[in-house]
C-alpha cells in the first residue's frame, strides 16, 4: 500500500483509548516544550504535522507487517515556541524523517513491534553562536519497541488490552529514555509512564509558566494516567464520551540552585467523539 498526505503512521507507544497526558503532545508539532521535561514516545516522525506531509509504503506478509514512513516538514515545529535548550531554533531547510517499522503477530491477540526514526537532513535547523557560526541541532535518532496483548479481538465483552512500550532518543546534547505500561478493561484504562531526560548542555531559558528544567542535568518524570469511556451516549452507536486525567511527579538531581528539585503537574479532560 502507498499513502500520501497528512496522517499518523504506526503507533509505537500506544496508550490504549483516548488518554490525556500533557507532556506528550498529540502530533508531530509542539511535542518538545523547553523547560518542561520530555516524554519521548516515537512520535517525531509519525506524522499528522501541520508543517508538512507524509509518504508511507506498507506491506502485510502473513503475520508480519512492514512499514516505511517519510515525513517532510519544518523541523522547528517540533518545539513549542521554537525553543530548544534555551535557544531559538533557526530553520535552514526542511527535515526528512525516515521511520521504518516491523511488527510480528504470532497470534491474533499478541503483537510485538520495533521501529526507529531519524532525521536524515544535516543542518536543517539550529542556532548561531557568539562567533557567528551556525550550530546544527537537527540530528535526532529514536528507537522504540512495543508489545501488545489485545484480548478484545477474541473476547469483545471481557477482553483485556495491555501495552508495554519503550523508546530511546539520541539527540543533540540530550538523551531520553521512556518506558510505559497500560491496561484497558471494561472501558477503563490505567497506565504508568517513566521518562528519563539527560541534558548535557543548556544556555538557560526564560519563561513565565514555572519552567522546571533550566540547566543541564538528569531529570525523571513519573506519570500515572487514566481514562474511561461512556459508549453509545443517548443510544447513539457512534457517539462516545471520554474522561481522561493524569498526574506527573518530576524530580531531578539538581542542587536547588537552578530551579526546584521536584514538581508535580496534573490535568483532566472531557472529549466528545462522534464517528461518521
What do these predicted regions represent?
Residues 13-16, 66, 75-80, 121-127, ...:
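Outer-membrane beta-barrel proteins
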Residues 7-11, 60, 69-73, 97, ...:
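Outer-membrane beta-barrel pore domains and translocons
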Residues 62-63, 100-229:
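Detector for outer-membrane/organellar transmembrane beta-barrel domains
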Residues 10, 15, 45-53, 73-74, ...:
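Solvent-exposed loop/turn segments connecting transmembrane beta-strands
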Residues 27-43, 79-89, 123-138, 200-215, ...:
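Flexible, solvent-exposed loop segments that connect beta-strands
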Residues 230, 263-276:
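Outer-membrane beta-barrel "beta-signal"
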Residues 1-73, 94, 103-106:
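Outer membrane beta-barrel
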Residues 67-125:
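Loop-centered beta-sheet repeat module
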Amino acid at each position: 500500500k502507498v499513502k500520501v498526505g497528512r496522517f499518523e503512521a504506526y503507533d509505537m507507544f500506544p496508550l490504549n483509548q483516548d488518554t490525556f497526558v500533557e507532556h506528550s503532545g498529540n502530533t508531530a508539532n509542539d511535542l518538545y516544550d523547553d523547560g518542561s521535561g520530555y516524554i519521548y514516545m516515537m512520535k517525531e516522525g509519525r506524522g499528522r504535522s501541520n508543517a508538512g506531509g507524509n509518504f508511507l509504503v506498507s506491506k502485510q506478509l502473513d503475520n508480519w507487517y512492514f512499514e516505511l514512513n517519510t515525513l517532510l516538514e519544518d523541523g522547528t515545529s517540533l518545539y513549542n515556541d521554537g525553543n530548544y535548550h534555551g535557544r531559538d531554533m533557526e530553520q535552514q531547510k526542511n527535515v526528512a524523517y525516515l521511520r521504518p517499522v516491523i511488527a510480528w503477530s504470532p497470534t491474533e491477540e499478541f503483537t510485538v513491534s520495533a521501529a526507529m526514526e531519524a532525521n536524515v537532513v544535516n543542518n536543517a535547523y539550529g542556532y548561531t553562536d557568539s562567533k557567528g557560526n551556525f550550530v546544527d541541532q537537527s540530528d535526532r535518532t529514536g528507537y522504540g519497541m512495543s508489545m501488545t496483548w489485545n484480548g478484545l479481538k477474541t473476547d469483545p465483552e471481557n477482553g483485556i488490552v495491555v501495552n508495554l512500550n519503550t523508546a530511546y532518543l539520541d539527540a543533540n546534547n540530550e538523551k531520553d529514555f521512556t518506558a510505559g505500561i497500560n491496561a484497558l478493561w471494561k472501558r477503563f484504562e490505567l497506565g504508568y509512564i517513566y521518562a528519563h531526560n539527560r541534558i548535557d548542555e543548556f544556555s538557560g531559558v526564560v519563561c513565565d509558566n514555572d519552567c522546571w528544567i533550566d540547566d543541564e542535568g538528569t531529570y525523571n518524570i513519573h506519570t500515572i494516567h487514566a481514562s474511561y469511556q461512556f459508549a453509545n451516549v443517548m443510544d447513539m452507536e457512534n457517539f462516545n464520551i471520554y474522561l481522561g486525567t493524569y498526574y506527573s511527579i518530576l524530580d531531578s538531581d539538581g542542587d536547588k540552585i537552578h530551579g526546584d528539585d521536584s514538581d508535580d503537574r496534573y490535568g483532566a479532560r472531557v472529549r466528545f467523539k462522534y464517528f461518521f
